[in-house]
Swiss-Prot record:
GO terms for cellular component: plasma membrane. This is Elongation factor 4. One of its GO terms (molecular function) is translation elongation factor activity. CDD domains: EF4_III, LepA, lepA_C. Disulfide bonds: none annotated. It is a peripheral membrane protein. It is an enzyme of class 3 (hydrolase). Required for accurate and efficient protein synthesis under certain stress conditions. May act as a fidelity factor of the translation reaction, by catalyzing a one-codon backward translocation of tRNAs on improperly translocated ribosomes. Back-translocation proceeds from a post-translocation (POST) complex to a pre-translocation (PRE) complex, thus giving elongation factor G a second chance to translocate the tRNAs correctly. Binds to ribosomes in a GTP-dependent manner. InterPro entries: EF-4, EFG_III/V, EFG_V-like, EFTu-like_2, G_TR_CS, LepA_C_sf, LepA_CTD, LepA_IV. It catalyses: GTP + H2O = GDP + phosphate + H(+). SMART domains: EFG_C (SM00838).
Amino acid sequence: MNHIRNFSIIAHIDHGKSTLADRLIQRCGGLADRDMEAQVLDSMDIEKERGITIKAQTAALQYKAKDGQVYNLNLIDTPGHVDFSYEVSRSLSACEGALLVVDASQGVEAQTVANCYTALELGVEVTAVLNKMDLPQADPENARAEIEDVIGIDASDAIPCSAKTGMGIEEILEAVVAKVPPPKGDPNGQLRAMIIDSWFDTYVGVVMLVRVVDGELKRGERFKMMASGAAYEANNLGVFTPADVPRDVLRAGEVGYIIAGIKELKAAKVGDTITLEKKLPNNLGPATEALPGFKEIKPQVFAGLYPTEASEYDQLRDALEKLQLNDSSLQFEPEVSQALGFGFRCGFLGLLHMEIVQERLEREFDQDLITTAPSVVYEVVKGDGEVIQVENPSKMPDAGRIEEVREPIVTVHLYMPQDYVGPVMTLANQKRGVQINMQYHGRQVMLTYEMPLGEIVLDFFDKLKSVSRGYASMDYEFKEYRASDVVKVDILLNGEKVDALSIIVHRSQATYRGRAVVAKMREIISRQMFDVAIQAAIGANIIARETVKAMRKNVLAKCYGGDITRKRKLLEKQKAGKKRMKQIGSVEVPQEAFLAILQVED
């Protein structure tokens, strides 16, 4: 036990934690040099392409320290993006120590702070590391000052390193051995292990990544999940060094995998405790108390996902279920839309999470999807005092039956160099933000705002990056529901409501957003044989209208000269025909129309 160290790496996006992990693995000989590729732990293609870590991955490394002892280091890589903060808290709860990696040329950024606080709350020992020291613009003194100033941990002995050139890697490993406490737990007690992650493998079923806290699990023993009571046999055990290495037993303090022929991802709930099924002569029997898990994560952003072909509904459901296996925060339920048919209402942690899920469905499962505009959950107090949660604009009751609508307010922390404070404040005010606080840390400024989540969901992050030339970073946490004057804007095509295009916006922006959506729709809907009226309405009030003019044949082409009445007769006849068509004709709404709502510029 004393020679085991469990640690993870926390950092803001692009501060180089995956590269650092590569170097640590290489130094400890976890992979042969020829298997060593950039970002070994980012195993999904989409992680490599976007250069972000989404799933937590692990590597068990053997390190011979300067004191001559061999230590087992379990490295758990964590994502840095705010949407995946639950992955971070999960990884950290399995560790005793964390390396806080800060880019020496950029200093502390928003998610670094958020993840670092998570670590400190969980009582993890945090060691600061200054990465990218090989860059000419690296400024270690400033970065140290910022770490002490913003996060409040001692950075005087922060380790300078460069994951690219390999400088400082030895020092980091020595620091892990010296500073990170060995795992607490009873190696001779009853088995208790926590599921840190689970994913589905087509050959062996569900693979569970566990951290053994007390006792040990041998191959072939039967174990049970404490939450559900379901029991399985441990067919295979092992550890990842990122490559998988089978073992006969997993002991207290180790992080490894269990394969037990489980078919359902739902059975292996992340955060659940595993213990032995029953008392046998050769074991200690089941534990009575489960380990404290982590809190269930609540989705913040909702959107509808629909298959382009109605017949692919079942495949989409299978795909979502498989994704949910290793992305426990994705939630979905079936829903029906008049415009789009059968599909699912999905809950995500944030916008990036939504994009990733969509992209994984398209790539890994070959799904063609239509996505509706993302919306957040509103609390609606009805006239009779009943409070309901509305996460889909089409479920919003009529204005007459509503007493008040409350929208979710979040506290947003924005970090940026002081040159960009002006534009960022303007942006935050446009989004109905209320400034709570402003602090200067050296050249960096931290602004704290309270803002409606609904404003952030659409495009706040992209706008923030563009007004600050990519320097600003943000993270947010939910604060409360507050009464607000929000209304539902419906889009009508030839007088018919298209439920999937409804949006919920603040009354002050309703007219503007309505006009913008309608104008955008006009460009997208192709011309028909009859006029198409596109309207935006609040209740029965029409607030904007555009018309897509009909295509028509030149019916007068065959008249040479001749009387005006003859021409008029032909035109009237054409008009009557168009009118008849309009009554029975239906308008196809192309996929772009649903995306148009997302791209309405402010």
